[in-house]
C-alpha cells in the first residue's frame, strides 16, 4: 500500500506540474508594431497584406499561436502610409472626379483626405468588424470598449460550423489597426488572460497608458492633442475655463 500511495502521489505531482507548465503564458512585445500581449507560446509571425474599404493594399503582420485550448492571434495593419497612396491615386484621377480624388486640400481634407485615405483610416475599425460579421457566425456581444484607454470594438461570436467561440477586440492606435482574435472550442472558458493583456508600447518598448480615452480618428490624425500619459501633468485649461 505504501508503494501504491507513493506512485499515486508522485503521479499527482507530475500531473499538477504538467498542468501548471501548460498554463504558463508568455508576454510578447513588439516595438515595431507597438503592442504587447500574452500568448500561450512564442507566436508565429506572418507578413501579409490588408485590403482596406477604399481598396488600398496595406502591409500587415499576423502574430499567431495555437494550443489544444484555442487559436490566438494579433493582426496589425499599418495605415501610416495611406495618405501617400491617396495622393498618388488622387493625382491620377480625371479632373473634377471627386469620388476618386477625395479632398486633397481644403476644409474637408482632415475628414476625407486625398483619395478618401483619411476616411479610410476613420473607417478602419468598423470595416474590420464588418468583415467578421460577414462570416457564418451568430453575434452574441457587440460593444464599444477600451483597452489601456484606447477605444475599440469588442465582439463575441459563435461560429455556426462547429459552435466554437470567437472573442475579438479591434482597435486603432497611431494609425495602426489591431485585431485581437481568440477562438476556443465549444464549451471552453473565455480566453480572459489573452483578452485582458493587450497593451500599447512606444518605439523603445515602454508601455503607453493615457489619462483619458484615446480615439485614433481624433488623436491619431492629430485633430485633437493626444491625451497626456499617466504620470504627466494634465494640460492647462484655456483661460476662463473652470
Tell where the protein language model's regions lie, with residue ranges.
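Surface-exposed amphipathic alpha-helical segments
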Residues: 43, 94-99, 103, 125-133, ...
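A mature extracytoplasmic/lumenal domain signature
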Residues: 32, 41-43, 49, 78, ...
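Bacterial N-terminal signal peptides that target proteins for export
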Residues: 1-10, 43
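N-terminal signal peptide c-region/cleavage motif recognized by signal peptidases
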Residues: 16-17
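Soluble non-cytosolic domains of exported or imported proteins
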Residues: 34, 116-120, 185-189
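Short, solvent-exposed coil/turn segments at beta-strand boundaries
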Residues: 38-42, 67-71, 150, 171-178
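N-terminal "mature-domain start" segment
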Residues: 22-59, 136-140, 147-150, 201-241
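Conserved polar/disulfide-associated segments of primarily extracytoplasmic proteins
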Residues: 51-165, 169, 239-242
Amino acid at each position: 500500500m505504501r508503494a501504491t500511495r507513493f506512485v499515486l502521489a508522485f503521479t499527482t505531482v507530475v500531473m499538477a506540474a504538467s498542468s501548471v507548465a501548460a498554463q504558463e503564458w508568455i508576454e510578447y512585445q513588439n516595438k515595431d508594431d507597438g503592442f504587447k500581449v500574452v500568448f500561450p507560446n512564442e507566436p508565429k509571425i506572418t507578413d501579409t497584406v490588408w485590403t482596406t474599404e477604399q481598396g488600398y493594399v496595406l502591409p500587415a503582420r499576423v502574430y499567431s499561436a495555437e494550443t489544444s485550448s484555442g487559436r490566438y492571434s494579433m493582426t496589425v495593419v499599418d495605415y501610416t502610409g495611406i495618405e501617400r497612396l491617396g495622393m498618388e491615386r488622387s493625382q491620377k484621377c480625371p479632373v473634377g472626379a471627386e469620388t476618386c480624388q477625395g479632398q486633397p486640400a481644403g476644409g474637408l481634407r482632415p475628414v476625407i483626405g486625398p483619395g478618401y485615405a483619411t476616411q479610410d483610416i476613420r473607417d478602419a475599425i468598423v470595416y474590420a468588424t464588418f468583415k467578421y460579421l460577414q462570416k457564418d457566425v451568430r453575434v452574441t456581444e457587440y460593444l464599444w470598449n477600451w483597452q489601456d484607454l484606447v477605444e475599440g470594438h469588442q465582439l463575441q461570436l459563435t461560429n455556426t460550423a462547429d459552435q466554437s467561440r470567437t472573442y475579438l477586440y479591434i482597435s486603432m492606435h497611431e494609425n495602426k489597426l489591431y485585431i485581437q482574435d481568440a477562438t476556443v472550442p465549444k464549451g471552453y472558458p473565455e480566453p480572459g488572460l489573452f483578452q485582458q493583456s493587450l497593451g500599447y508600447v512606444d518605439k523603445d518598448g515602454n508601455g503607453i497608458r493615457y489619462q483619458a480615452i484615446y480615439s485614433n480618428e481624433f488623436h491619431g490624425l492629430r485633430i485633437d492633442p493626444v491625451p497626456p500619459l499617466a504620470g504627466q501633468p494634465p494640460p492647462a485649461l484655456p483661460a476662463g475655463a473652470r
